[in-house]
Regions:
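Active-site-adjacent substrate-binding region
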Residues: 35, 162, 169-278
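Extracytoplasmic/secreted proteins, especially bacterial periplasmic and envelope-associated proteins
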Residues: 11-26, 31, 96-103, 116, ...
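Structural recognition of the beta-strand scaffold that forms the well-ordered cores
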Residues: 32-33, 52-54, 62-67, 90, ...
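Solvent-exposed loop/turn segments at secondary-structure junctions
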Residues: 6-8, 37-40, 57-59, 69-73, ...
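A non-catalytic alpha/beta surface segment that caps or lines the substrate-entry region
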Residues: 2-58
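Sec-exported extracytoplasmic/periplasmic mature domains
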Residues: 1-8, 21, 25-32, 103-113, ...
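Acidic/histidine-rich catalytic neighborhood of metal-dependent amide-processing enzymes
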Residues: 85-188
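Second-shell loop/turn segments in exported
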Residues: 1-14, 38-42, 83-95, 107-108, ...
Length: 278
C-alpha cells in the first residue's frame, strides 16, 4: 500500500508491479511477466501486467494459487458520493491476496516442494463498470487480466490439478462461505480447503455454509482455461455490502486489516499445498 492505489496505467501501478516481481524473485521463484493491452468497459486501453511466479517449472503436477493485485479506480460504493471518483487504496481488495502469496513463496523457498506451484497475480480485475456509470453492469468488464491469461496461458497447454483464488482475505470480521461457481466447477477442492481449515482450528473463518455466485478471476480459469478453481472470498451477512464495510470505499486501508484472517487463510492454503506434495 506504500505505493498508493495500484490503478492500471499509473506510475504507482508500474512501481508496485516491479516490487511484487522482485519480491517473488528474492524468494527463489521463476517470474514471468505477461503484458497485455486489454480494453476496459469505456474503451480505455489498459496496460495490464499479469505476474506469474513459478516453483519447479518443469514439474508436470502443478497447483495454481492466484489473486489480483490492481486497485479499483473509483470508490463507487463509498457512503459519501464525494468519494465516488477517488481511487481505492485496496489494502484488502486485494493487496491482502498478494501479501499471502508472497508469504507462501517465502515458506516454499525455506521448505522446497517437488510439485510445481504457480502464483499468479492477475491485473485489471477491478476495472468493471462503476455504479455511477450510465452503462449497464457487465460481468465481462471485470477480471480482464485473468480472462486474457486463461485464453493465453504463460505456458502453452498449461494445466494444473486445481486452482485456489484468494480475494479480500484480510478484512476484519471476514468469514468465507462456499462460493457458488467454486462448488459448481470444483466442489472437491472446496471440500478439501474447508476441511483443512477445520482441521487447523480455523473453522470459524470457513463456516460450512453456501455463499452466492461471484464474478471473479476463478470464473475464466474454470470456463476458459478448464482448470477447476475455487474462490476464497468473504461473505458478510450483516453489512451493507456482502463483501464487507470497506469494499470499494476510501476506507479499504491498513486500519481494517486483521492479521488473524490473513493467517487463517494463508496457513490453510499452504497446508493444502504441502498435503498435495506427499
Amino acid at each position: 500500500c506504500a505505493f498508493g492505489p495500484r490503478v492500471p496505467n499509473t506510475e504507482a501501478h508500474r512501481l508496485c508491479g516491479t516490487y511484487i516481481a522482485e519480491k517473488f524473485k528474492s524468494f527463489g521463484a521463476t517470474v514471468t511477466d505477461q503484458y497485455a493491452d486489454v480494453k476496459a468497459y469505456d474503451g480505455t486501453v489498459l496496460k495490464a501486467r499479469n505476474i506469474i511466479a513459478s516453483y519447479n517449472p518443469d514439474a508436470k503436477a502443478r497447483i495454481l494459487v492466484c489473486g489480483h493485485w490492481d486497485s479499483r479506480p473509483w470508490a463507487d460504493n463509498d457512503p459519501d458520493s464525494a468519494n465516488w471518483h477517488k481511487p481505492v487504496l485496496a489494502a484488502n481488495d486485494a493487496a491482502s491476496d498478494v501479501a499471502v502469496m508472497l508469504e507462501m513463496a517465502r515458506l516454499i523457498q525455506l521448505h522446497p516442494l517437488e510439485i510445481g506451484i504457480d502464483f499468479i497475480c492477475f491485473d485489471a480485475e477491478d476495472y468493471g463498470v462503476p455504479q455511477w456509470s450510465d452503462q449497464a453492469g457487465d460481468a465481462s468488464s471485470w477480471c480482464l487480466g485473468s480472462q486474457y491469461w486463461a485464453a493465453n496461458p504463460h505456458v502453452y497447454g498449461y494445466q494444473a490439478r486445481f486452482g485456489i483464488l484468494m480475494d479480500m482475505v484480510g478484512g476484519r470480521g471476514s468469514t468465507f462461505s462456499k462460493e457458488g461457481y467454486s462448488q459448481r466447477y470444483a466442489s472437491q477442492v472446496v471440500d478439501l480447503v474447508w476441511n483443512t481449515a477445520a482441521q487447523l482450528g480455523y473453522g470459524q473463518f470457513f463456516p460450512m455454509r453456501d455463499g452466492g455466485y461471484i464474478t471473479d478471476d476463478h470464473v475464466p480459469v474454470n470456463e476458459i482455461a478448464g482448470i477447476p478453481c475455487i474462490d476464497i472470498i468473504p461473505y458478510f451477512t450483516d453489512a451493507p455490502s456482502g463483501f464487507g464495510p470497506t469494499w470499494h470505499t476510501v476506507n479499504d486501508n491498513m486500519e481494517h486489516i486483521d492479521r488473524q484472517v490473513l493467517k487463517a487463510v494463508g496457513q490453510t492454503v499452504i497446508q493444502v499445498i504441502y498435503n498435495e506434495n506427499q
